[in-house]
Amino acid sequence: MDQVMAWVEPGKQFAKDSIRLVKRCTKPDRKEFQKIAVATAIGFAIMGFIGFFVKLIHIPINNIIVGS
């Protein structure tokens, strides 16, 4: 019986901790959500521009190398 409890107890503890975590978590309010969304959009835009300019620079360099 002790061996069974040794296997069951970690699962029970994990379930208890998980339930406590979910109860403690709260959804962000509108202001916080908009702040996160704007920051994410700015990050996407910056990464897009970086990728665009890298591609813009590498196309002529690639044409010079391959065109020779």
Swiss-Prot record:
Subcellular location as annotated: Endoplasmic reticulum membrane
Stored InterPro entries: Prot_translocase_SecE_dom_sf, Translocase_Sec61-g, Translocase_SecE/Sec61-g
Annotated keywords: Endoplasmic reticulum, Membrane, Protein transport, Translocation, Transmembrane, Transmembrane helix, Transport
GO MF term list: protein transmembrane transporter activity; ribosome binding
Extracellular side: 62-68
Gene Ontology biological-process annotations: post-translational protein targeting to membrane, translocation
Transmembrane segments: 33-61
Bilayer topology: Single-pass membrane protein
Any one GO CC term of the record: Ssh1 translocon complex
Cytoplasmic side: 1-32
HAMAP family reported for this sequence: SecE
Task of the protein: Necessary for protein translocation in the endoplasmic reticulum and multi-pass membrane protein biogenesis.
Subunit text: Heterotrimeric complex composed of SEC61-alpha, SEC61-beta and SEC61-gamma. Component of the ribosome-associated ER translocon complex.
PANTHER family: SEC61 GAMMA SUBUNIT
Family: Belongs to the SecE/SEC61-gamma family.
Protein's UniProt name: Protein transport protein Sec61 subunit gamma
Species of origin: Ciona intestinalis (Transparent sea squirt)
Upper lineage: Eukaryota, Metazoa, Chordata, Tunicata, Ascidiacea
The gene coding this protein: SEC61G
